[in-house]
């Protein structure tokens, strides 16, 4: 990995499970769309995460450009798939973190940060030296390597991770990742081992731990049941080792209609998923209301804060 003053830029990138080998040091982009220069699309207080993340003051959220998944229904597709964002320096990212802290954020929330891990770690080092003291959230689609999870040790306090699928066929069709579950399962286990059981401050704001999300998809609740089976197995083995969050907010963005999911989930479908979660002993987490499936909950990627 050739080094700049602050960052070791991959010359054969293996940061995500695709291990595409892109020479990012030479400015080439990988499968994720990321090259040699850090890129972000929004940095602002965000109020629509789980209550223990957003609290009353908001989560200091930075949306990074690019993504290691290619979800056909992605609500953030302008930044994840179409490259929207502004190139920034590591030093500027550190100042963004400090600005969000000064605005009263409960935490720093890194959205799809995996493809920029070395850059973000360098920025966190700078920001910490200048007084950053907030918990750091890794907001990830779950498609990670165990090695990348380990590389975040000492930097990430809270994992806000998806478990999207169990079915290889479904993850191939909807996210171009037939190995999604094979990669996500050990990665999530590494997250739980690293973070430990959830811990909260006096205001009920999460300080460390794992929130494990699942977004129920229309027409695919059988795979939701399989996901919940895996969540239940983890919870049975170590009760309270994570906070489950079952979401109904699916909205058919981007290319969803081309893949047979061009509608919202029905109340009947979501009730079946929630009831299954309850039956599996996952009642200690969050269950979204159907009213959350609204486009206005999607942030505007207008380069605010970057």
PLM features: what roles do these ranges have?
Residues 40-61, 95-113, 285-287:
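Short Fe-S-cluster ligation motifs
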Residues 65, 69-103:
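Glycine-rich active-site/cofactor-binding loop and its immediate structural neighborhood
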Residues 81-84, 110, 137, 285-288:
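Residue-level detector of family-conserved "landmark" positions at structurally sensitive sites
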Residues 95-259:
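Conserved AdoMet/S-adenosylmethionine-binding subsite of the radical SAM
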Residues 89, 115-116, 292-293:
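Positions that flank functional sites
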Residues 1-29, 197-306:
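Auxiliary Fe-S-binding modules of radical SAM enzymes
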Residues 1-68, 72, 76-81, 301-303:
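N-terminal [4Fe-4S]-dependent radical SAM core
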Residues 86-90, 177, 181, 263-267:
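Flexible, glycine- and charge-enriched loops at secondary-structure boundaries
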């Amino acid at each position: 990995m050739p080094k700049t003053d602050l960052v070791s830029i991959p010359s054969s990138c293996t940061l995500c499970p695709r291990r595409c080998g892109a020479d990012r040091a030479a400015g080439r982009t990988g499968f994720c769309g990321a090259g040699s220069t850090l890129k972000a699309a929004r940095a602002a207080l965000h109020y629509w995460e789980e209550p223990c993340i957003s609290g009353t003051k908001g989560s200091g959220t930075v949306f990074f450009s690019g993504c290691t998944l290619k979800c056909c229904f992605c609500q953030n597709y302008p930044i994840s798939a179409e490259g929207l964002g502004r190139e920034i320096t590591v030093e500027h990212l550190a100042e963004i973190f400090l600005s969000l802290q000064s605005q009263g954020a409960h935490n720093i929330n890194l959205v799809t940060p995996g493809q920029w891990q070395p850059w973000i770690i360098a920025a966190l080092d700078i920001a910490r030296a200048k007084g950053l003291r907030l918990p750091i959230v890794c907001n990830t689609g779950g498609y990670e390597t165990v090695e990348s999870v380990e590389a975040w040790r000492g930097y990430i306090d809270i994992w806000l991770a998806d478990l999207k699928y169990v079915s290889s066929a479904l993850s191939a069709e909807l996210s171009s990742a037939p190995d999604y579950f094979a990669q996500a399962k050990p990665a999530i286990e590494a997250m739980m081992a690293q973070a430990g059981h959830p811990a909260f401050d006096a205001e009920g704001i999460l300080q460390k731990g794992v929130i494990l999300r699942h977004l129920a998809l229309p027409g695919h609740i059988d795979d939701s049941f399989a996901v919940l089976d895996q969540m239940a197995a983890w919870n049975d083995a170590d009760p309270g080792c994570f906070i489950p969050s079952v979401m109904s907010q699916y909205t058919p963005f981007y290319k969803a209609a081309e893949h047979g999911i061009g509608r919202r989930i029905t109340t009947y479908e979501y009730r079946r998923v929630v009831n299954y979660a309850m039956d599996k002993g996952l009642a200690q987490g969050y269950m979204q209301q159907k009213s959350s499936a609204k486009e206005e909950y999607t942030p505007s990627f207008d380069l605010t804060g970057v």
